[in-house]
């Protein structure tokens, strides 16, 4: 009888724990969803509150920067290195290595013959 009671108690605690974890996950999901909606609301409010003259000034600055070859824009561009590309050349090196193994199965094994004269 006591064994049956302890099994019921364990089942009760497991169920309570599972319901608690699921509840916490649901609360977390709702909080994250509300935070995203609040961020969108702030962005829309900021865009609405910005004066039309401010928008024109920003547009003018963007146009001036592109016409005058703004150095900050040029400096922020990613530099691409010149020369061989090691990422794409790795397959070429691998195929050369396999080809060398096919032609000479023991490329690193050197046979040394010693001339021993007595």
UniProtKB/Swiss-Prot annotation:
Hydroxyproline modified-residue sites: 81, 84
Gene Ontology biological process terms from the UniProt entry: cell-cell signaling involved in cell fate commitment; maintenance of root meristem identity; phloem development; regulation of cell differentiation
Glycan attachment points: 51, 84
GO molecular function, one term: receptor serine/threonine kinase binding
Signal peptide positions (record): 1-29
The keyword Signal appears for this protein: yes
Protein keywords: Developmental protein, Differentiation, Glycoprotein, Hydroxylation, Secreted, Signal
Protein name per its UniProtKB record: CLAVATA3/ESR (CLE)-related protein 26
Organism this protein belongs to: Arabidopsis thaliana
